[in-house]
Swiss-Prot record:
The keyword Cytoplasm does not apply. Disulfide bonds: none annotated. It comes from Eremothecium gossypii (strain ATCC 10895 / CBS 109.51 / FGSC 9923 / NRRL Y-1056). This is N-acetyltransferase ECO1. It is found in: Nucleus. GO terms for biological process: chromatin looping; DNA replication; double-strand break repair; establishment of meiotic sister chromatid cohesion; establishment of mitotic sister chromatid cohesion; mitotic chromosome condensation; mitotic sister chromatid cohesion; regulation of mitotic nuclear division. Keywords: Acyltransferase, Cell cycle, Metal-binding, Nucleus, Transferase, Zinc, Zinc-finger.
């Protein structure tokens, strides 16, 4: 029996679809702020908000609550340490911190709020110096008060300067002399140093007003309770270019050869 041949309808041609890839607009590019040096995407609200916060802290310092930190007091007169501009006859050691224009506080390890506030400052500091972000244990962790301290300079309700220092043991032999001219360490000479300046910073708009020197003097007199140290006993940790200039002004010594030396530690 012959098979029946079925008529087939002509096949419709397959409709092809073209895929399109969407790329981000070219306008979503990085912009680098000329003042704070932060790079951010100008079309990103989150990036812009982060830049605004970073920019404000970098230029003007961090807004500081009066409850953060313990004000340093002169052990003889019981007066707060203040710059000459605010330490006249109207300055009283019994006044509240919030009523004072300028004062210096130290950070207590274990007090979460003030340690966190100081950490925000250190984030800026380490970014500026291209320094490691994991060198805060000696001043921030509870039970480490014998290892170092952090101090903050407060002006008009903002933290405009900060310094962190390590306590150095003479037996550790960490002191060195650094030649100012070449930034090379002098071999086989180990000076006696007692304090290591790990970081020092002043916000951009307050630089050139002596705040860094006041912080250094505070550390020199009060970092070791009841024991003032000499300037040359304060050593620097790999000072930056600006830090090297500060160190040269503050505690460099002139060798008999005529060369200037800065105390450093390793």
């Amino acid at each position: 029996m012959a098979g029946v041949k079925k008529n087939r309808s002509p096949r419709k041609p397959t409709k092809l679809l073209q895929s399109r890839l969407k790329f981000a607009h070219s306008s979503a590019t990085l912009k680098k702020c000329t003042e704070c040096q932060m790079s951010y995407i100008i079309d990103s609200p989150a990036d812009c908000a982060e830049h605004k916060k970073y920019h404000d802290l970098h230029l003007y310092g961090k807004k500081w609550l009066a409850s953060w930190g313990t004000a340093i007091q002169d052990t003889c007169s019981s007066q707060y340490i203040t710059p000459p501009s605010t330490s006249g006859g109207n300055a009283s050691g019994n006044g509240a911190k919030a009523d004072r224009e300028d004062y210096i506080v130290y950070i207590t390890p274990g007090k979460t709020a003030e340690v966190k506030a100081m950490m925000e400052i250190m984030y800026i500091v380490n970014n500026e110096l291209t320094a490691p972000h994991d060198e805060n244990d000696f001043w921030s962790e509870e039970g480490t008060s014998s290892m170092g301290r952090a101090f903050v300079y407060i002006k008009d309700g903002r933290a405009v300067g900060a310094i962190t220092v390590e306590y150095l043991k003479e037996d550790d032999s960490r002191g060195r002399w650094m030649r100012v001219s070449t930034r090379e360490l002098v071999p086989e000479v180990v000076p006696r140093v007692r304090l290591g300046i790990s970081r020092i910073w002043v916000c951009r708009k307050q630089r050139g007003q002596g705040i860094a020197t006041r912080l250094l003097e505070c550390v020199r007199k009060y970092a070791i309770l009841g024991n003032e140290v000499a300037r040359w006993e304060m050593a620097w940790s790999q000072p930056s270019e600006s830090g090297g200039k500060l160190a040269t002004r503050y505690n460099s010594v002139r060798h008999k050869s005529g060369e200037l030396l800065i105390p450093c530690y390793i």
